[in-house]
Swiss-Prot record:
This is Undecaprenyl-diphosphatase. GO terms for cellular component: plasma membrane. The keyword Cell wall biogenesis/degradation applies. It catalyses: di-trans,octa-cis-undecaprenyl diphosphate + H2O = di-trans,octa-cis-undecaprenyl phosphate + phosphate + H(+). Keywords: Antibiotic resistance, Cell membrane, Cell shape, Cell wall biogenesis/degradation, Hydrolase, Membrane, Peptidoglycan synthesis, Transmembrane, Transmembrane helix. The gene is uppP. Belongs to the UppP family. It is found in: Cell membrane.
Length: 277
């Protein structure tokens, strides 16, 4: 992998991580059209996501520091556990359990079978349709303060599906939130906050394994990966700011059509033998 390829993949990661269109799918697809014509790998994707999640930490720093502070105060008995921010801290922990468990259990599949472009194309279309249905039929009346433990678990299960490229971490969790009746801003905000523990854990784990076992790195060096991560951070911050404004007055339908179109094009390219799965 060249430095130019690393920058391109960092741009792709930053542009697509928080849009409900699957960043892992785009990394996988774009990798096939770069000069190296190869899958950058699950480790590359996970490590570059550290950059995008750093953008979340900075954009939502007031929310995150408040939640951590109030949750810590509740744990030490200084405030009641019913405090809204302390409760949100617990709900983020609960919602992170499914992806943590399944990520460890299915690690080998995530690195191999799940990265088939046939699966990616299918998931792009299927979850695009599900996002459309949720956006169209969801009541969209519940604020984030109405989040329950049950809803937090369902959010977490939806996030776990994003272990399959093409599903989209944000797309899956946002669709789940809309289906449960949450407003677009509420569903989107919780999706971003919920991703922080899981993505940082996954990225740091893959970073550790790449450093201790270079054979797991894939077709890139650590230098190129870190450059891609830095690029992803800058771009992702701008995307978050734009998306939070966009969904306050618009639906997710443009992303739905994009997912279906991309999935269809991918099927055509695979069927014609232009790219390999």
């Amino acid at each position: 992998m060249t430095w130019i390829e690393a920058i391109i993949l960092g741009l792709v990661q930053g542009l697509t991580e928080f849009l409900p269109i699957s960043s892992s799918a785009h990394i996988r697809i774009v990798g096939e059209f770069l000069p190296s014509a190869t899958d950058p790998g699950a480790a590359f994707t996970a490590i570059t996501q550290l950059g995008t999640e750093l953008a979340v930490l900075i954009y939502f720093w007031r929310d995150i520091t408040r939640i951590i502070g109030r949750w810590s105060a509740a744990v030490t008995g200084r405030i009641p556990h019913s405090d809204p921010d302390a409760r949100m801290g617990w709900l983020i922990i609960v919602g992170s359990i499914p992806i943590a468990v399944l990520g460890l259990l299915l690690e080998d599949w995530i690195d191999t079978e799940f990265r088939s472009l046939w699966i990616t194309a299918t998931m792009l279309i299927v979850f695009g349709v599900l996002l459309a249905l949720a956006d169209r039929l969801g009541r969209q009346t519940k604020p984030l303060e109405k989040l329950t433990v049950r809803d937090g678990v369902l959010y977490g299960l939806a996030q776990a599906l994003a272990l399959i490229p093409g599903v989209s971490r944000s797309g899956g969790t946002i669709a789940a939130g809309l289906a449960m009746g949450y407003t677009r801003p509420a569903a989107t905000r919780y999706a971003f906050l919920l991703a922080v523990p899981a993505v940082f854990a996954s990225g740091l784990y893959k970073l550790y394994t790449s450093l201790t076992d270079p054979g797991t790195q894939g077709p890139y060096g650590m230098g190129e990966t870190l450059v891609a991560t830095a690029v992803a951070f800058v771009v992702a911050y701008a995307v978050i700011a734009w998306l939070m404004r966009f969904i306050s007055t618009n639906s997710y339908l443009p992303f739905v059509w994009y997912r279906i179109l991309l999935g269809g094009v991918l099927f055509a390219l695979l069927g014609a033998g232009v790219i390999s799965a």
